[in-house]
Amino acid sequence: MTALEQLQALPIWQGTVRATPLGGGITNVNFVAEDDNKRVVVRVGDDIAVHQIMRFNELSASQAAHAAGVSPQVLYHAPGILVIDFIEGRSLTADDFQDMSLLGQAIDLVARAHREIPHHLRGPSLIFWVFHVIRDYAATLQTGG
């Protein structure tokens, strides 16, 4: 089943669902989807153990980030599927951060995320630390894997 077919089969839709691919996902496929009542972002992607990507961690982090007030709400999840509220916006550019007011807001948001999200994490919280992933790749190569 393709990512789009998985999206269309979700039990959350009312009426016709329309989906538009959303760029960015390296290890998942993302869509902006809407039905007669809501507009959401749908992420479709399975665990990739060799890269230490485990979607239950993403779910836990997303729920904690919402509880901390820095991320949209998780509306639905199933193995390989995450559905969150859609927030209208745009990606900021380097030029945007020349505005000291906007830069200050961004710094405050990142600080708040680092300070508040850990207070809302529940259950097992494994890390995804790029330096550890690279070390693990190197060890795998050294052992002939």
Locate each region found by the language model.
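Juxta-kinase regulatory segment immediately upstream of eukaryotic protein kinase catalytic domains
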Residues: 1-18
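ATP-binding pocket architecture of kinase catalytic cores
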Residues: 21-129, 133-143
